[in-house]
Swiss-Prot record:
The species this protein was found in: Nitratiruptor sp. (strain SB155-2)
Region named Involved in Mg(2+) ion dislocation from EF-Tu: 81-84
Domain of life: Bacteria
InterPro entries registered for this protein in UniProt: EF-Ts_dimer_sf (IPR036402), Transl_elong_EFTs/EF1B (IPR001816), Transl_elong_EFTs/EF1B_dimer (IPR014039), Transl_elong_Ts_CS (IPR018101), UBA-like_sf (IPR009060)
Keyword set, alphabetical order: Cytoplasm, Elongation factor, Protein biosynthesis
Protein name per the record: Elongation factor Ts
Name of the gene encoding the protein in the UniProt record: tsf
PROSITE patterns: EF_TS_1, EF_TS_2
Length: 305
């Protein structure tokens, strides 16, 4: 089948592999992106593929943490241009939307647009704001994390709202959680920077681990390693995969001698108790939204002829 320049571009962005290697892998995979990534990794050409992150839209991520640090809200509001995203009216709108979501019990954007705000339905409120600002604006998504019993939440915004994170921990005692509040903000900053795919090893689907074993075995076979040696090496490869892709296994950005789990454990112990991270949500502005092809795609097309 014909492989487009846009497909080659995306595969290059996700794997770091060369243009012709990407083209061949896509042809071998009949255009299936995930299969092409697997082919490149088995050949040892690609690193672990980045999540498809064709960031496109403008706007902002906003985070709100309740005064008692028991609930955190994260929301993405999109605009058509970055110019409007920097507009004070847009910023005020985002603040209002964020507060409204934090105080309501809505669970979906569809529900949100039917709720009352300032004596009108939210959908009508947004239409009026769009008319005032002069550009289409949409609440794309939102999430909340709330804790019951001994627990604490916090959040972090990176790059002026390009990335946002909320994270929660549970503790054996409330005073332990209170002592971890600031550390949890640092953990949220770590999540923004390191983008862990999973919370811990138990969160990784079994099929993902099996696929990593397959890829590791194919790489080692290519290097000429015998089967009995491959069998001994693979557990170490999987251990490294877990450490690099889970929040608790990653080295903490503010102290790379320790994992995030070690940092939390030690801080909780110093406060006279125990604690564990129970969940996190990370948003990156526009992730997953297709964007208009840039000139680079045309450049790739010219080189493929």
């Amino acid at each position: 089948m014909a492989i487009s320049a846009a497909q080659v571009k995306e595969l290059r962005e996700r794997t770091g592999a060369g243009m012709m290697d990407c083209k061949k892998a896509l042809q071998e995979a009949n255009g299936d992106m995930d299969k092409a990534i697997e082919i490149l990794r088995k050949k040892g050409i690609a690193k672990a593929a980045k999540k498809a992150d064709r960031v496109a839209s403008e706007g902002t991520i906003a985070v709100q943490v309740s005064e008692d640090y028991k609930c955190a809200t994260i929301v993405e509001v999109n605009s058509e241009t970055d110019f409007v995203a920097q507009n004070e009216n847009f910023k005020s709108l985002v603040e209002k939307v964020k507060g409204h979501i934090a105080q309501s019990a809505v669970e979906s954007v569809e529900e949100l647009y039917k709720t009352p705000i300032d004596n009108v339905i939210f959908e009508e409120y947004m239409k009026a704001e769009i008319a005032k600002i002069g550009e289409n604006i949409v609440v794309r998504r939102f999430d909340k994390i709330c804790v019951e019993g001994p627990g604490v939440v916090n959040g972090y915004l990176h790059m002026g709202g390009k990335i946002g994170v909320i994270v929660a921990a549970s503790c054996d005692k409330e005073d332990v959680c209170a002592s971890l509040k600031d550390l949890l903000k640092d953990v949220a900053m770590h999540i923004a920077a390191m983008n862990p795919r999973y919370l811990d090893e138990a969160s990784i689907p079994a099929e993902v681990i099996e696929k990593e074993k397959e890829i590791a075995a194919a790489q080692l076979e290519k290097e000429g390693k015998p089967a009995n040696i491959i069998e001994k090496i693979i557990p170490g490869k999987i251990k490294k995969f877990v450490e690099e892709n889970t929040l608790l296994g990653q080295k903490f950005v503010k102290d790379d001698k320790k994992s995030v789990k070690q940092v939390i454990d030690e801080a909780a112990k110093a406060a006279g108790g125990s604690a564990k991270i129970i969940g996190f949500i990370r948003y990156e502005l526009g992730e997953g939204i297709e964007k208009k092809e840039e000139d680079f795609a045309a450049e790739v097309a010219a080189q493929m002829k």
